[in-house]
């Protein structure tokens, strides 16, 4: 029946209507490799790089100083801020207090919560002064400091020595008195 209906058409039309299976057989079938048809082909493309000139002078001003400057020279000591440089008397003791990079004594103030006040039902706070960078006989330093503070304050103080870290914690004494003690010793 198909042949009889094809006789009606011209030979040119028949060639257009005829179905050829050779093109499908040569091409890869879609279901055999679905990723090949789904993903685009990879092509290498190198990015272009262009260096932009940047003025780093504003950033360099904010960077910390790599080398610690020398101790500043003043006309008289102590300075108006109360700072004094270390003296030769500091080398005569059994212990030594290394100064920080900004040439100040390594004294740090902490505030910690203490006991509950029963009248106000509020916690009292206590100030602890931590002395760091203690080299040498740290217990001799603590004994000298304790006797100096108890003499000036008139009451006993609590202290804690951390020999491994080279730290002393003092409770019940103002930071200013501890600073005066170390300046009087030449540190």
UniProtKB/Swiss-Prot annotation:
| Top-rank lineage group of the source organism | Eukaryota
Signal sequence span per UniProt? none
Q: Does the keyword Mitochondrion apply?
A: yes
Query: Looking at the UniProt record for this protein, which Gene Ontology cellular component terms does it annotate, in alphabetical order?
Result: mitochondrial large ribosomal subunit
Q: Does the keyword Nucleus apply?
A: no
Q: What is its main location?
A: mitochondrion
Q: Which cysteines are joined by disulfide bonds?
A: none
Which keywords, in A-to-Z order, does the entry hold?
Mitochondrion, Ribonucleoprotein, Ribosomal protein
MF terms (GO), sorted A to Z: structural constituent of ribosome
Q: Where in the cell is it found?
A: Mitochondrion
Listed under GO biological process in this entry are: translation
| Protein family (similarity comment) | Belongs to the mitochondrion-specific ribosomal protein mL49 family.
Q: What is this protein called?
A: Large ribosomal subunit protein mL49
């Amino acid at each position: 029946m198909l042949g009889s209906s094809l006789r009606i058409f011209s030979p040119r039309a028949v060639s257009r209507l005829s179905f050829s299976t050779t093109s499908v057989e040569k091409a890869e079938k879609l279901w055999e490799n679905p990723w090949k048809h789904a993903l685009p082909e990879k092509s290498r493309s190198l990015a272009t790089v262009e260096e932009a000139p940047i003025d780093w002078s504003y950033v360099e001003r904010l960077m910390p100083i790599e080398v610690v400057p020398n101790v500043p020279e003043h006309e008289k000591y102590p300075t108006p801020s109360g700072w004094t440089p270390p003296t030769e008397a500091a080398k005569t003791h059994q212990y030594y207090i290394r100064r920080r990079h900004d040439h100040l004594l390594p004294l740090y103030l902490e505030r910690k919560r203490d006991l509950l006040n029963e009248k106000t039902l509020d916690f009292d706070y206590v100030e602890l002064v931590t002395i760091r960078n203690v080299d040498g006989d740290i217990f001799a330093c603590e004994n000298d400091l304790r006797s100096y503070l108890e003499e000036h304050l008139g009451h006993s103080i609590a202290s804690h020595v951390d020999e491994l870290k080279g730290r002393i914690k003092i409770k019940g004494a103002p930071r200013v008195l501890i600073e005066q003690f170390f300046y009087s010793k030449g540190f």
